[in-house]
Amino acid sequence: MGNSCYNIVATLLLVLNFERTRSLQDPCSNCPAGTFCDNNRNQICSPCPPNSFSSAGGQRTCDICRQCKGVFRTRKECSSTSNAECDCTPGFHCLGAGCSMCEQDCKQGQELTKKGCKDCCFGTFNDQKRGICRPWTNCSLDGKSVLVNGTKERDVVCGPSPADLSPGASSVTPPAPAREPGHSPQIISFFLALTSTALLFLLFFLTLRFSVVKRGRKKLLYIFKQPFMRPVQTTQEEDGCSCRFPEEEEGGCEL
């Protein structure tokens, strides 16, 4: 018992003596984090200059702080004991340790290529804003059937195969495909009625205009012919004129 205690005490003394000797041989080991051992000042611990840091003690130099620029934004400012932390601006996501790179986000149903975001090919899907397009699940490999068809944003939904369904059980049918955007029958009927009304109104207007123009033309023709019409004398006027003679001829009759 006494020997074991003696051995423990001796070991502790050796460790303490080793640390003391090491500190005497390398005074830079006493420099804490946030400082560096300045050889130009007789190995005195000097604080790290601005925009630099030392995360561990005993460093002879300080590391340059990271600058968050471009697609990066600062999540944590740099201090004398820790580096700055960056993340990506909206529309991008981090890649690598410590967010060393930023990658563009894509919409669901797309994947990022060298030329930018591209829609997933038929038979593949991507339900996230990052990553690659993955193939639809092959339901037949598991002896199942497709209940809901897959899209570029969603995987297929598998269900029991038709052989597994009992005769009295109701089969599940896939949902009806979404109708392509277009005109509803009500809107088409409305436009047809509106077009028919407009055509009838136009036909009535043209007929009325043609009638008015025709009447006006006859009246104008009559007015134009009035100055050129010769007045016709009555029978009494012609008889009265035939009975009158000049005075000289009347005088010559008295013989």
From Swiss-Prot:
Record's keyword annotation contains Cell membrane: yes
PROSITE patterns hit by this protein: TNFR_NGFR_1, TNFR_NGFR_2
Swiss-Prot/TrEMBL keywords: Cell membrane, Disulfide bond, Glycoprotein, Membrane, Receptor, Repeat, Signal, Transmembrane, Transmembrane helix
Bilayer-crossing regions: 187-213
Domain of life: Eukaryota
InterPro entries: Growth_fac_rcpt_cys_sf (IPR009030), TNFR/NGFR_Cys_rich_reg (IPR001368), TNFR_9 (IPR020413), TNFRSF9_N (IPR034020)
Interaction with LRR-1: region residues: 214-255
Disease: Immunodeficiency 109 with lymphoproliferation: An autosomal recessive primary immune disorder characterized by recurrent sinopulmonary infections, susceptibility to infection with Epstein-Barr virus (EBV), persistent EBV viremia, and EBV-induced lymphoproliferation or B-cell lymphoma.
Protein known as: Tumor necrosis factor receptor superfamily member 9
